Amino acid sequence: MHKLKIISIAITVLLLVVFSVYFLQPQKSEIQEIPQSVSAKQAIPDFAEIKQTTEKKKAFFSYLRPEVETQNAHILLQREFVHGLRAKHIAEEQITESQMEELLWLMKEYRVEENDDLDLVFDKLLTRIDIVPVELVLVQTANESAWGTSRFARKGYNFFGLWCFRKGCGFVPKRRNDGAAHEVAKFDDLSTGMYTYLRNLNRHDAYKEMRAIRKQLRDQMKPISATALTEGLTKYSERGDDYVVELKHMIRTNQDLM
């Protein structure tokens, strides 16, 4: 009887621990989660083994397209949330505490400074929280990863040429200049890599021209064109204007394959 009582107490304690972990701990909302695609952690195809150029390109685009669409859908979810809060603000309706927490998280995530003028905050957020055309992502990742054959893509899901600056955060480039401390970022899965890449385009000062072009297209109710947005990516590569010219060429020549 004594043993049964001890077992009963132990089970009760265990249930309380489980309850506290899953129900009392603060949970990330859908807005804050990095969405994980079905293929996020799957092995990366060996694109180098595909000798026929057209087939290699098709395989590359087919592998990455679902991930781009997944992350863009998540960005639109965040954007819809901001639109909803702005509508409440205009209507002078009360923004709830949980909604304000979400708003503050988005401001931090997209590097928008706090301001008493909420209209300004919403405008800045909506300029940053927006999609990047699938075609642009596909050709840029192809360019940066040598069609998925670079070691950074194969071993670290980095199809984007993204750097990191904490020792051990990624791969040390073989051709890194003396005194340089950067590494090429390594990601645990494709979803995290794609999320980080799109967030980088949407919040880094280097790409504010790209965001301005996108906003202008939105304001004019025109489609967000991959070719148009390339004009804002001169700072993505040391090659500057030549890099933009190459991206445009890749968009044009691979249109039928994407």
What does each of the following model-derived ranges do?
Residues 2-139, 143-258:
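Catalytic cores of secreted/periplasmic lytic hydrolases that degrade extracellular macromolecules
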